[in-house]
A protein has these predicted regions:
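PRPP-associated nucleotide enzymes
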Residues: 1-169
């Protein structure tokens, strides 16, 4: 699993990651590892580090939170942009924004508030539904952003729907 946090929640001990092409069978008789496929040169899916995995998980022996925070630190080192605040597209953009703010010495503020009862919008099949989903999912925290020059950190750009709606807020 790429979600080691699920093991934490149930009190299970993380032993190791399942290898590429491996099948692990768990029965009453024990655990058996099968590798029926030829070994290939696999590469990690970067979206696991920047978007899909929860920040309280580990992947490849690395903390997802620390990876995302370090992405923000590196981005701040490259950026010469000045602003009043740093904010993030919640939730997965938060660690990178925190890292960016720490490195740049620009204060972090919650500029967008997320409705946690709306799911991922980029997977919706129709643009109109995706746009409505973004509108329901995010709202500007006006007291934090009004009349401010903002650095907005997002973790990924899949379709651009979220970006366009946020700018209009």
């Amino acid at each position: 699993t790429s979600e080691t946090c699920s093991l934490d929640i149930i009190g299970a001990k993380f032993i190791r990651e399942i290898e590429n092409g491996e099948i692990v069978v768990i029965t009453n008789k024990g655990i058996k590892s099968i590798k029926p496929f030829p070994v290939v040169n696999c590469r990690p899916d970067i979206f696991e580090y920047i978007y899909f995995s929860r920040p309280d998980s580990e992947l490849g022996g690395k903390s997802i939170y620390d990876c995302r925070k370090n992405f923000g630190i590196e981005l701040a080192k490259e950026s010469k942009t000045q602003a009043d605040i740093v904010t993030a597209v919640p939730d997965s953009g938060m660690p990178a924004a925190i890292g960016f703010a720490a490195q740049s010495k620009i204060p972090f503020e919650l500029g967008l508030i997320r409705n946690h009862y709306v799911g991922r919008t980029f997977i919706e099949p129709v643009q109109k539904i995706r746009s409505l989903g973004v509108k329901l999912k995010l709202n500007a925290n006006k007291s934090s952003i009004k009349d401010k020059k903002i650095i907005l950190i997002d973790d990924s750009l899949v379709r651009g729907t979220t970006c366009h709606k946020i700018v209009k807020m």
